[in-house]
Amino acid sequence: MKLYANNKCLDLSVPQIMGILNFTPDSFSDSGQFFSLDKALFQVEKMLEEGATIIDIGGESTRPNADEVSEQEELHRVVPVVEAVRNRFDCWISVDSSKAVVMREAANVGMDLINDIRALQEPNALETAVKLALPVCIMHMQGQPRTMQANPYYENVVQDVLAFLQKRTNECLSAGIKKENLIWDMGFGFGKSVQHNYQLLQNLNEFCQIGYPVLAGLSRKSMIGAVLDKPVDQRIIGSAAGALIAVQKGAKILRVHDVAATSDMLKVWQATANA
């Protein structure tokens, strides 16, 4: 299983680490501490040295109750960072956006992967993704970030999320997205209760069996905090445990804040798998 973009290849026969760079003043985890270009580049270098192969750049906070960001503001935040990272590093660059214009402009300066929490459902997003012909991660979310955690309900969360991803995948394929360019994300924490999240994690292998690489993003989220009863900055070990379970069940990309801890975990897991 491999991804290709811009003359680069990402080998998914081993799990890959996607390091999170929130270029926003209001992210739930890092509270804007990398909200300057110099700090952002320093953080990117650190994450790459620690073992990340993908850097995921986001200009809109998608935490619960987050305010939406205008197209112009998101462009202003994201495009210069993508360009600066591309000029300096040879890593994979993912952009966490649902806006067609952001996808297009980011691709012009070196983006390799579209990471869309709204699964290409915003205006012109699907058509833009088809034209760009880059790998794209589609995610399940019930509602929108502002309201998604208001009593989420499912008949069966595993089957409901699976049905959405299969339906959306078929729509993407019909529109012209190549099968080998699709990645699935179950959307931990996006319109799900703590119980829903753990049911999805427990059954993550069902999603992997369909044949698309699965991205797991549960780093520092409330599903970890609820079990540990610890604030965001004290969820590193819990997040690594969740990531390990995801990998054991077949996840191929781990979207994380704490790259070093995740990389150490993967090395021990790999040594065991190879024994």
From Swiss-Prot:
Binding of Mg(2+), residues: 22
Pathway linked to the protein: Cofactor biosynthesis; tetrahydrofolate biosynthesis; 7,8-dihydrofolate from 2-amino-4-hydroxy-6-hydroxymethyl-7,8-dihydropteridine diphosphate and 4-aminobenzoate: step 1/2
Keywords, alphabetical: Folate biosynthesis, Magnesium, Metal-binding, Transferase
UniProt GO cellular component terms: cytosol
Binding site for (7,8-dihydropterin-6-yl)methyl diphosphate: 62, 96, 115, 185, 221, 255-257
Cofactor(s) needed for function: Mg(2+)
Subunit note: Homodimer.
UniProt protein name: Dihydropteroate synthase
Organism encoding this protein: Haemophilus influenzae (strain ATCC 51907 / DSM 11121 / KW20 / Rd)
